[in-house]
């Protein structure tokens, strides 16, 4: 009976999206329906996560067809902490959007498309078979294609073209990988694939397939293949930029973690060093981006790229500590990047400028805003006791155990550069000078202050309650790095030769 609740985090947003299509002219009802739905979704996800932590993973077999023949949803520590975190930030993002009163965007069913994107994101975390992961990716991407073009500006359309082309190529590669893998192992269920690949051992065909998935998911995660990201994020409004930054690349990172711990772990002599190399390249280019630009929205976009490098570096260490740190940092980064883009969006709103050298005098108007900015910088930099610290320490530990001293050095350097680029914005906000004149600021709306306050509290809470979060991420790491344990807890009836 409890397993039936596993469909609700995806079903509730889907039903709400359909209802909102017919309520586009009633903003008040739409607001309460959406926020109520996502709040309930977050609570249900958290309850399921608590149950899984105390007992065992939950599976839901649709239509009474057990794995590997039927569609299966899996609620384990990894999937449910991702669903809970994603549902929480989506709730805040939509509260932010309704607070802005985006009436023009509502005519294009903006809330519905955000919910459809949420369905794809949450479904990607919950599904336990390869084809349905592809379906969820396509739902997510179709909704994102619409959202990225809603403004109808030339800049958005140009960014959308790059975004669409690269993601279509990624989807083709994903589908090609699915076909080749099914031909090779004859199944699409995760646990069944893991068992059969383990029985096959080292195989050139499987290695080629794993490389195809690596490229496909790298395009989704902006790992090296990030050309679409800075331009796309820079032209979006604040809530959509926060939504994309918090979730879109993280789904790709999640898929990389799930695939290259559980499914293709026996090919780590090739894949994991390649992942570490790609992570290093991503970190370096991201660091160059945050230094090169004066546009604060593009600086924020390159911060996303750096964080993806951190996460995948942890995965590339192929150690328990590194993978555990990657999962922790992945969860943390969803919240922190939401906070970053809300702060950057608020800066643009209250000052009217996107170039940091034109920001000055904010200290006199909004001193508490500066406190939120500093906390965000420390969280991104991994300064104790804030939320970025535990994940980075574990990734450091994993890199040391793996002997990846170059990756470790690059992570330290790029972390400092990431902090420097944000402190540079902070300096101009408080001590900068624009021809000796003070910028005429708008007042930060109360709803923005409330949402920023909630995110700041959560960032601090993650750092303080790190042992609780690490307990979840450690369980997730243990389950996904042991295919035998995964089979025992998820699908004990399956055998490799079935």
UniProtKB/Swiss-Prot annotation:
It is found in: Cell membrane. The keyword Transmembrane helix applies. One of its GO terms (biological process) is ATP synthesis coupled electron transport. The keyword Transport applies. GO terms for cellular component: plasma membrane. It is a multi-pass membrane protein. Its main location: membrane. May form a heterooligomeric complex that consists of seven subunits: mnhA2, mnhB2, mnhC2, mnhD2, mnhE2, mnhF2 and mnhG2. This is Putative antiporter subunit mnhD2.
């Amino acid at each position: 009976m409890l397993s039936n609740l596993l469909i609700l985090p995806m079903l509730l947003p889907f039903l709400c999206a359909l209802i909102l299509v017919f309520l586009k002219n009633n903003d008040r009802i739409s607001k309460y329906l959406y926020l109520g739905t996502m709040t309930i979704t977050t609570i249900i996800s958290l309850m399921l996560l608590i149950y899984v932590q105390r007992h065992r993973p939950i599976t839901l077999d649709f239509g009474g067809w057990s794995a590997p023949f039927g569609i299966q949803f899996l609620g384990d520590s990894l999937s449910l902490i991702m669903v809970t975190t994603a549902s929480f930030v989506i709730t805040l993002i939509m509260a932010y959007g309704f607070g802005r009163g985006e009436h023009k965007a509502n005519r294009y069913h903006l809330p519905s498309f955000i919910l459809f994107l949420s369905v794809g994101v949450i479904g990607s975390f919950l599904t336990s078979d390869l084809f349905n992961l592809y379906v969820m990716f396509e739902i997510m991407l179709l909704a994102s294609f619409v959202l990225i073009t809603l403004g109808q500006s030339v800049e958005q359309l140009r960014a959308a073209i790059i975004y669409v082309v690269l993601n279509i190529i990624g989807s083709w590669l994903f589908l090609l990988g699915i076909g080749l893998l099914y031909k090779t192992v004859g199944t699409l269920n995760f646990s069944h694939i893991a068992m059969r690949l383990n029985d096959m051992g080292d195989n050139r065909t499987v290695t080629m397939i794993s490389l195809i998935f690596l490229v496909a998911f790298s395009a989704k995660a902006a790992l090296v293949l990030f050309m679409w990201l800075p331009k796309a994020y820079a032209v979006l409004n604040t809530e959509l930029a926060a939504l994309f930054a918090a979730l879109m690349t993280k789904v790709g990172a999640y898929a990389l973690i799930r695939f290259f711990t559980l499914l293709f772990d026996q090919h780590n002599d090739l894949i994991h060093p390649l992942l570490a190399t790609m992570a290093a390249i991503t970190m370096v280019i991201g660091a160059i981006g945050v230094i090169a630009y004066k546009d604060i929205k593009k600086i924020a976009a390159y911060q996303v790229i750096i964080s993806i490098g951190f996460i995948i570096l942890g995965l590339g260490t192929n150690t328990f500590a590194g993978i555990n740190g990657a999962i922790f940092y992945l969860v943390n980064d969803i919240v922190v990047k939401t906070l970053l883009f809300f702060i950057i969006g608020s800066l643009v709103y209250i000052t009217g400028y996107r170039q940091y050298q034109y920001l000055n005098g904010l200290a006199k108007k909004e001193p508490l805003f500066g406190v939120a900015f500093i906390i965000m910088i420390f969280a991104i930099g991994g300064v104790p006791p804030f939320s970025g610290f535990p994940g980075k320490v574990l990734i450091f530990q994993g890199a040391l155990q793996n002997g990846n001293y170059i990756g470790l050095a690059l992570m330290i350097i790029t972390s400092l550069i990431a902090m420097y680029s944000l402190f540079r914005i902070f300096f101009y906000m408080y001590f900068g000078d624009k021809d000796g004149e003070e910028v005429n600021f708008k007042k930060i709306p109360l709803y923005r202050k409330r949402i920023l306050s909630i995110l700041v509290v959560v960032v601090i809470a993650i750092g303080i309650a790190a042992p609780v979060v690490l307990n979840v991420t450690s369980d997730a790491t243990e389950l996904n790095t042991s295919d035998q344990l995964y089979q025992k807890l998820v699908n004990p009836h399956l055998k490799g030769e079935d």
